[in-house]
């Protein structure tokens, strides 16, 4: 049995009980969904099993909880997009930057990116929410991660991992669709209830709730000047072959850092 202290009260739980089960017992005490827990002050995901500790709950009203929500929603969106478009038709799908209280996603490939297409992606996302698909986590070697992302056509990530110093990385998946995320996730897709996809320029904006009101989507506020500036920065990176950290590492490793600095100046 594990002794778990919650709100000053200690209760016994059988070994093998998950934090998800404990969270369900206390969900009625919270206005917003419990997404993570703090075990002796350290964050853990809900699939972890109980142990002797002092426990507190993290909801979408807390920064770590909202971050987990947004990561999980991003992964679910990517899976839905690839499913609707067909994996072989997606040339590029990347969350570039935040804009207008949302996240701008650049999308290129053999598809027509319009409202009808995005409505199909949203419908697929809602299907995943209804199914409450577990978001699985596995640890793999860095070499295996490189091989995986090359196989999936995610060459930017494979390029990045070639310079990673640690020997293992965490891979998250939804129903077989895998990607790398640095940070915690919610337990299943059923928690990702609020989202929207809005066409914008050469991509779309993924809208998600804010900590101020986790049950409501903020209005999208186009910011044309900021978008133009961020787009110009992205285009400059492409011209310099510096679209991501992996590309920057390549230039540093090849001894071109001084030339790069002069070019930027």
Give residue spans per PLM region:
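Short aromatic-centered micro-motifs
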Residues: 4, 37, 179
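Short strand-turn-strand beta-turns centered on an Asx-Gly dipeptide
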Residues: 6-9, 38-41, 108
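Short, contiguous acidic and Ser/Thr-rich linear segments
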Residues: 8-18
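Short amphipathic, charge-patterned alpha-helical segments
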Residues: 17-29
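Active/ligand-binding-proximal structured segments within catalytic/core domains
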Residues: 23-26, 66-84, 95
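Short secondary-structure junctions
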Residues: 28-32, 84-90
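Short acidic beta-strand-loop surface patches of small beta-rich interaction domains
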Residues: 34-48
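Auxiliary tRNA-acceptor-end handling modules of aminoacyl-tRNA synthetases
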Residues: 52-68, 80, 89-100, 104-265
């Amino acid at each position: 049995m594990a002794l778990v202290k919650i709100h000053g009260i200690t209760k016994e739980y059988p070994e093998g009980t998950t934090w998800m089960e404990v969270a369900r017992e206390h969900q009625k005490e919270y206005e917003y969904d419990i997404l993570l827990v703090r075990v002796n002050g350290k964050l853990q995901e809900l699939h972890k099993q109980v142990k002797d500790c002092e426990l507190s709950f993290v909801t979408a009203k807390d920064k770590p909880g909202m971050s987990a929500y947004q990561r999980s929603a991003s992964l679910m969106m990517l899976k839905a997009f690839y499913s609707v478009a067909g994996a072989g038709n997606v040339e590029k799908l990347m969350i570039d930057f935040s804009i207008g209280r949302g996240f701008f996603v650049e999308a290129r490939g053999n598809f027509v990116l319009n409202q009808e297409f995005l409505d199909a992606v949203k419908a697929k996302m809602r299907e995943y929410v209804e199914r409450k698909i577990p978001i699985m986590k596995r640890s793999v070697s860095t070499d295996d991660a490189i091989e995986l992302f090359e196989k999936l056509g995610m060459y930017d990530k494979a390029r990045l991992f070639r310079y990673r110093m640690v020997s293992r990385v965490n891979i998250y998946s939804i129903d077989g669709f895998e990607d790398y995320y640095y940070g915690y996730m919610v337990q299943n897709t059923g928690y990702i209830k609020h989202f929207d996809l809005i066409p914008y320029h050469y991509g779309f904006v993924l809208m998600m709730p804010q900590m101020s009101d986790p049950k409501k989507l903020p209005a999208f506020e186009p910011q044309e000047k900021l978008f133009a500036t961020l787009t110009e920065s992205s285009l400059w990176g492409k011209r310099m072959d510096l679209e991501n950290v992996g590309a920057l590492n390549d230039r540093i490793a090849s001894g071109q850092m001084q030339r790069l600095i002069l070019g930027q100046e």
